[in-house]
C-alpha cells in the first residue's frame, strides 16, 4: 500500500513540473518583442539625419563659361550676378530660382590663341563696388602670347555674405594694351555659387 502511495505522489508531481517548463517557454516567446522598439528607434535616427541635410542654405553649383574672340586691343566688363549675360545658366536660370546667392570662388583662365610674335598684355581688375566703367588698376595681368590662370577667393570678390539675387556681386574689367586687333585668345571662367531660399 505504501508503494502505491508513492507512485501516486509521482503522478501528482508530474504535471507540476510540466507547468514549470511551459512557463519558461512562454518567457522565451516574449523576448523577440523586446527588440521591436530598438529597431523603430534606429529608423527614427536615420530620419532625423536626413532632415539635417536639407536646410535653408539650398545648394552649391559650379558654372563654367567663356568670353571669346579677345583681341590684342580688347577691353570690356564682365558683370557677375543677374547681369552675367555670358552665362545664361546662372543669370537666367539658377538666380531666378533662389532669392539669395553668393559667389565664393572664381578661377579666370586666359587661354592664348595669339602667335608668339604678338606683343602685349591682358590686364584684369575686380570691382566689388560694381561702379567702375574703366580699368583703374594694372596689377593683375596675362601675357597675351601665353596661357595662364588666376584664382580669386571669397574675400577678394566680396563672397562671404549672401545677397539678393537681383543684385550683382562684382565686376571684372579687362583691357589689353596691344596696338593691333590681332587675335589674343579667350577667358575660360569657373565660378562656385551658393544659393539660399528657393522661390
From Swiss-Prot:
One protein family per Pfam: Luteo_coat
Renumbered residue ranges of the record's region Disordered: 1-21, 33-52
Protein's cellular compartments: Virion
InterPro entries tied to this protein: Luteo_coat
Gene Ontology CC: one annotated term: T=3 icosahedral viral capsid
Example of a GO MF term: structural molecule activity
Keywords (A to Z) from UniProt: Capsid protein, T=3 icosahedral capsid protein, Virion
Superkingdom as given in the UniProt entry: Viruses
Keyword Amino-acid biosynthesis: no
Skewed-composition ranges (Basic residues): 7-21, 36-46
Functional note: Major capsid protein.
Family, per entry: Belongs to the luteoviruses capsid protein family.
General remark: The N-terminal region like those of many plant virus capsid proteins is highly basic. It has been suggested that these regions may be involved in protein-RNA interaction.
Official protein name in the record: Major capsid protein
Amino acid at each position: 500500500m505504501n508503494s502505491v502511495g508513492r507512485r501516486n505522489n509521482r503522478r501528482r508531481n508530474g504535471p507540476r513540473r510540466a507547468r514549470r517548463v511551459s512557463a519558461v517557454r512562454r518567457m522565451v516567446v516574449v523576448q523577440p518583442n523586446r527588440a521591436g522598439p530598438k529597431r523603430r528607434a534606429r529608423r527614427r535616427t536615420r530620419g532625423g539625419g536626413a532632415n539635417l541635410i536639407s536646410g535653408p542654405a539650398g545648394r552649391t553649383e559650379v558654372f563654367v563659361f567663356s568670353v571669346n574672340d579677345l583681341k590684342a586691343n580688347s577691353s570690356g566688363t564682365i558683370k557677375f550676378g543677374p547681369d552675367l549675360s555670358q552665362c545664361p545658366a546662372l543669370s537666367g536660370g539658377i538666380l531666378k530660382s533662389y532669392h539669395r546667392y553668393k559667389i565664393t570662388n572664381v578661377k579666370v583662365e586666359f587661354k592664348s590663341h595669339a602667335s608668339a610674335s604678338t606683343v602685349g598684355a591682358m590686364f584684369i581688375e575686380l570691382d566689388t563696388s560694381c561702379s567702375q566703367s574703366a580699368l583703374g588698376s594694372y596689377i593683375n595681368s596675362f601675357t597675351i602670347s601665353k596661357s595662364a590662370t588666376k584664382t580669386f577667393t571669397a574675400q577678394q570678390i566680396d563672397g562671404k555674405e549672401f545677397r539678393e539675387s537681383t543684385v550683382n556681386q562684382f565686376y571684372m574689367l579687362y583691357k589689353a594694351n596691344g596696338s593691333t586687333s590681332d587675335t589674343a585668345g579667350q577667358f575660360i571662367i569657373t565660378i562656385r555659387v551658393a544659393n539660399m531660399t528657393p522661390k
